[in-house]
Amino acid sequence: MSKKDNSLAPVMPSRMMIRLSPLAGVVMFTFLLTGLAACLWAILVSGKVDLLPEKLDWDAIRNGEITHHIAKELAHVPFAKSAADLERAASWLAIGDTGPRVRQGCANWLFLTDELKIHPHAAADADARAQKVAALQEQLSKRGIRLLVVLVPDKSRIASQQLCAVERSPLLASRAQDWQRVLQAKGVEVLDLAPTLQPLGSDAFLRTDTHWSEVGAERSAAAVAERIAALGVSPTPAKQFVASVTAPQPRPGDLVRLAGLDWLPESLQPAMEQVAVTQIKEVQGAVEEAALGEDDLFGDSQLPNLAVIGTSFSRNSNFIPFLERAVGARVGNFAKDGGEFSGAAKDYFSSPAFKQTPPEVLIWEIPERDLQSPYRDDIMLDGQPG
């Protein structure tokens, strides 16, 4: 007869555990009841929670977008947000965890998780985007508008020496180049900024932010200006710009906010970086006066013939001012924070600015991380798909 292994026997609770268990149960019950009450109040009384997404179809139901939308809406309920903030703070202070949306690399370098995701239908979604861009390029060409696609490489690609324990899959190595080749085969003008930014290394990006630094933005703007010149386009209206640099000052990073740590005292957050800001101003004078002709009754000559659509990259670190200085002309900025691949394009093509004063060159800035994410075709010209 084999001897019984006492190590497999259940551990009996201690007297302390027995005494505290009713209190723990009451605390847990109170917490759950409070959370339920807060959610019911938000749904039934406050009117601040929309249970259904704007567009409801079978794809949204099959892909779980409805439950995802509800969870996202309920996350903004005051009690839920406070509880989430406390959880994020405890995880960060105890074990250095930055949450599901942010990864921590070397020495307080933060990276966006979206850059590292392997999407289930990556190839199909990337191809759908390429087909869309090619179709739009053809439509724009018929209107006399030239399209220049500008690919912004991932921070985790360019600042790879700062990844440390953060892993970037080999499957992502050729993501941008593969997409660029597909577009070029379709006759689309593409500028990949990776060769421009790679020599800068980690200096090209901000440490606690998803976006490029001013060094990276300025170098990228120069590359875009060089490509525009190669297209034989003369940017208008011609302007002159002067620049000055401020003393370094603290710059909050958006990755700290995405990690849910921006509400903590600064001393408990990931170390904030000090950034010198370039101030670029237009010089008023002879260039502007010479540009005004006698037949320019409505000031059309002062409207930019270059326009930019894209994401928050075009709205950060002075990219547009650097571009204006590099081309020597004003540039229309129609980029959209959080717009991802389609947001800015969709808004711009339906706007009076595009319909009434279309540009000669449209610069479409696209982050690499958006190339393979789930895609829904929602960009139209004149009410028709591109």
Where are each of the predicted segments found?
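Extracellular glycan-modifying ectodomains
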Residues: M1-G386
